[in-house]
Amino acid sequence: MRVCVIGAGLSGLAVGRALKERGISFVCLEKAPDVGGIWRQPGAGERGPGYRTLHLNTAKQLTGYADFPMPSSYPLYPRHSQVAAYLRSFAEWAGLLDHVELRTEVVSVRQDADGTWSVVSRDADGVESARRFEQVVVASGHHTDPALPDPLPSGADSFTGTILHSLDYRDGGDFAGRRVVVVGLGASAVDIAADLSRHAERTLLSVRRGLHVVPKQLFGMSVDEIAEAPWWNEMSFAERRRWVEQALLVARGRLSDYGLPEPDHPVFSSATTLSDEILSRIRHGAVIPKPAIASFDGDRVVFTDGSAEAADAVVYCTGFHMTFPFLPAGCPVAADGSVELYRRVVPAGRPGLYFVGLVRPVGAITRLVEAQSEWVARLIDGAAALPPVKEMREEVGTYLAGIVQRYGRTAGASIQVDVGPYLAQFRESLPV
């Protein structure tokens, strides 16, 4: 077998399709009981980010695969179960299921002296086996290692309520009649706070730092359609920033009017949060903004403004660590937390190892994943070639320097990409 693909979510299936189209033999290892990745609803005993109210934040016509669109019956922003069903349908249509080994967890990936890769996996019965491959494509994402404040605020160990991470949150109905504090202002935080506000007795949203909250549509266009529009990509970075800032003022006013902290950075200097719902829930009094948590005191949560609220649960929506425990330390995440990949795909100096889907665009990721997958397949069969290692490292250094200049040293910033310019790299080097 030539290639091992790790993960059978949106990215892994795109890789499988590209390899199959080029006649490259492969196996795809997936630790879950079905394909679909983060869009699957985790079963009993499973952990996963697929809470029941999870929907796409990007429009279906740009999130579906190019030659296998999502069903016309789907809404513009399908729910997670619809996306999971769509991904399984794609796997069936593309003939990928025979290549996927389910309930198979990758334990270790190491390169041998002869350049091949030894992959150790564990099946559902706990039996480990080792196989050799010429190439390995990691498409498992980075939503498995929950990031919590370390240390938690003082008093957390004696808090009488429940403290959990969004990875373990499933349904607002589980908190019916309870008082809940949600921590964060990212995608999962605003989704979960809105969900809880329909079930919990009281829902508080604790926000340490302001982020730009962006409606899913501006002037009747989804934000991912805007990100791929020719007129958008013809504008300079400064022009795009001014356009969005003015559009946000028109669409929702200032965040301080909702009791949220104003961002301390301009648009495109940090991650944005897409939501049509959270600001409305705040306006209706269903979600109450609060500052950061300072400490816990028995059944009370004390905030940095000195106020305190009784709470039965605290849900930390504080993201994930970028970890790949089956890979050697420092690959692809350096000691400073930056992801060091040529074109956000190839770790320089590790021939035969690739990463697909380890990017964070403003807009839909699918076009990027398909471009990465096609490029990787061409690299594997020799239709494309990599530059020298020195040149790849120089590209990585230049890219990361630009990221620091634009975003600062924010966690996760090193996987941010602009859709248009990023896709252009592949179009120029791989003309169809």
What are these regions (language model features)?
Residues 61-62:
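Aromatic- and acidic-residue-enriched carbohydrate-binding clefts of CAZyme catalytic domains
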Residues 396-404:
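Long alpha-helical segments found as membrane-embedded helices
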Residues 1-53, 69-217, 221, 229-392, ...:
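Flavin (primarily FAD) cofactor-binding/catalytic cores of flavoenzymes
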